[in-house]
Amino acid sequence: QDCAMIDYKGGGGGWGYSFKLAYAQRCLVQRCYSREGRHPFVANGRAWGPNVFVDCYATESKNETGSHMKYATGLLYDNVKVKAEKFPGDYGLVVRNRGPFYEHGQMGGQNVFWNCVSLKYNSIPGRIVCETPAHAMNFAIGCKGLRENGTDCNYFNSYNGPDGIYD
């Protein structure tokens, strides 16, 4: 909690993941900040949950925040704000099926985005993708951003009190 990862410099691959949960269960990441992270707040590689990212903020994000690369369950993104890098990237808050793209496939089930915000540079609304697989549910509740087709949402682009589920 109360950590920052600022201006990471390095190559691709697994580098630049600001706050990553892998093989994780019952973890709380709270009030953390990322600047120029490749994947600011992610769970990948069999994060079985419950796991929570609460009151976290990312600026100049270089890629998606959400479950990433293999299946993650029981994730709560509570009042997380992500702002993309200055170049026109298609990033934001994401849980989806990435198909045969490398080893990614379906990235998660039983995940919730609660009162989260996705922005592109210049405060243009950013993308939120919250696909639901056949065997589980994912939710985006009270979030602000661009709702991508196939996204299961409740009260999208509106405040949904309380500020956070976790508080």
Which residues fall in each region the model found?
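Right-handed parallel beta-helix
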Residues: 1-9, 23-39, 47-62, 71-86, ...
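Metal-dependent DNA phosphodiester-chemistry modules and their immediately adjacent helices/loops
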Residues: 66-68
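Short, tandemly repeated low-complexity microdomains enriched for cysteine and small residues
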Residues: 88-95, 124-126
